């Protein structure tokens, strides 16, 4: 897993026409989406958040095949000319994709071992969770931007394990195995974890709380995320300590 260079997210230009998306440098991502292709990848949509789905008028197929993935994207609102040249669908905002790049997307691991065994299996190397717009829980995924040291000598591995040995609902630990590659420059990377279907099942409450634990360079830390169960989505509200 290679580190990713991150740039600041763009800001709106108050003088820009509201009928089109606010100005953003084309080399910067302006959204984090879930790419959802149909069964034979003859079309796909991009889930922007809990309630907004986007239709890419200038792309017929997902560049990632039939696999559902999280991705960084730079897009703008489609113009009438874009729609005329491409395709449109009723009831869905149409956008023009400038570029899109997938991030590592993995399932959650169901815990079957003790805390000590987990460390041996999944690794015990430190990392930091970066609190920015890409660290978010939404659309059935927990997406994390993390920071660690990269020496370029080995592929780092990260896993999110559901801790069934902890008496707290929806308790997860993020494990990092640097495979001995613990010296080098500090860099960031993104990873997204697909929350299990049982977590998304409808319940009496709209939201539940997910607790995330990880080993940082200064000791064990935790953060909490509220996720929406009854719509299969997750809210972006989070808090850490």
Where are these regions (language model features)?
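Bacterial signal peptide processing site
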Residues: 11-14
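Cys/His-rich zinc-coordinating "finger/knuckle" motifs
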Residues: 17
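First exposed extracellular module after export/assembly in secreted or surface-exposed proteins
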Residues: 22-241
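C-terminal motif of bacterial Sec signal peptides marking the signal peptidase cleavage site
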Residues: 6-9
